[in-house]
């Protein structure tokens, strides 16, 4: 069996988004399943819109997702000589020709076709003239006037397009640059690509590219056109649906394992299984079971998956992943050990690393930086609150065994001996030590913050009341 070779070919005119990442993942999995080769090609022929910064973020996003590529990255901008070589072959073999028609002439042809109720197109007036090269001319493919193009798509099944529906497409522009249709065929052939997975917005390109393959006598790869990803309202996916660049998900504290698991289910299934290890994905993904209906992006499902993966990680690993986020918040003095001590209180409450840092922030900051919202104070403070805080402070200061069990007992005894209910002191004590009204177990929170810091926080709120 011929070795399976796939590729991902983004254009560096923007960042890598969800749709592109899914295409890359499907192509990567197919290659890895068959122990094949996965290539990365940067289609940077649009010199005006292509930017190095976009190339950098695409590569960073791919690396973060773990979609490693084989061999050197191919840059289209460095392959012009090869494209011109192939164009010369097509001209010499009679499969392409020079066209000297002006833009105005071509627009007139199209308008005449529209008036006749026909598809607007170039009418092939230069097709048989055997014109020579012209600085203002273009090179066109001589599309067979009869027949059809048929290919079996991994997603859509058999697709057939009549040649009469196709134009004599431009292969080389008047400025001498090759068009996308020509460049992509040459690249895929030279890279020995056997399977091309891409968005179904490319379906109309495929018959044109197959005609170029046929003209050159090259083997045609297998195509799979996956449907676009829609928003939850079944409209075109956009930022308002929660979809952003892959790099932004990384910055928001999502895990690559969760992203991969989520992306693969947007257009592929394996029975009813929802959660996969990477090895399972490689084992199961063979190019079948690709969905023909568009998938809907659901940020809540992604958050749920991320929380699942986050909570399965060892505390030490989560702490390592959190360090950059903690540093970004300005906590340069916080150690990994400190993060590990606080983590167990909050990991079940957070969906992402960024949210985890946000929840832990009241514990990580010092008493001097802790603030209390006036609305929270008004909501829970009574005439007796300050007195309760004074007494509890003294009890906590005197407590030798600063452990959750003893702190819980201390609070319980205070409530019982003063004929109180927990709601009369619990919220004010929590607000004093953490700055917020909600959170984990109060006694565990107090212990994790530490006696010295807890006393300082109690003093701070007491003086504010």
From Swiss-Prot:
It is found in: Cytoplasm. Zn(2+) binds at residues 99, 101, 126, 128. Keywords: Aminoacyl-tRNA synthetase, ATP-binding, Cytoplasm, Ligase, Metal-binding, Nucleotide-binding, Protein biosynthesis, Zinc. Transmembrane segments: none annotated. One of its GO terms (cellular component) is cytosol. A motif ('KMSKS' region) lies at residues 236-240. Its cofactor is Zn(2+). GO terms for biological process: glutamyl-tRNA aminoacylation. One of its GO terms (molecular function) is tRNA binding. Its EC number is 6.1.1.17. InterPro entries: aa-tRNA-synth_I_cd-bd, aa-tRNA-synth_I_codon-bd_sub2, aa-tRNA-synth_I_CS, aa_tRNA-synth_I_cd-bd_sf, Glu-tRNA-ligase_bac/mito, Glu/Gln-tRNA-synth, Glu/Gln-tRNA-synth_Ib_cat-dom, GluQ/Sye. It catalyses: tRNA(Glu) + L-glutamate + ATP = L-glutamyl-tRNA(Glu) + AMP + diphosphate. ATP binds at residue 239. The keyword Metal-binding applies. A motif ('HIGH' region) lies at residues 10-20. Monomer. NCBIfam families: gltX_bact (TIGR00464), PRK05710.1-3 (NF004314). This is Glutamate--tRNA ligase. It comes from Lawsonia intracellularis (strain PHE/MN1-00).
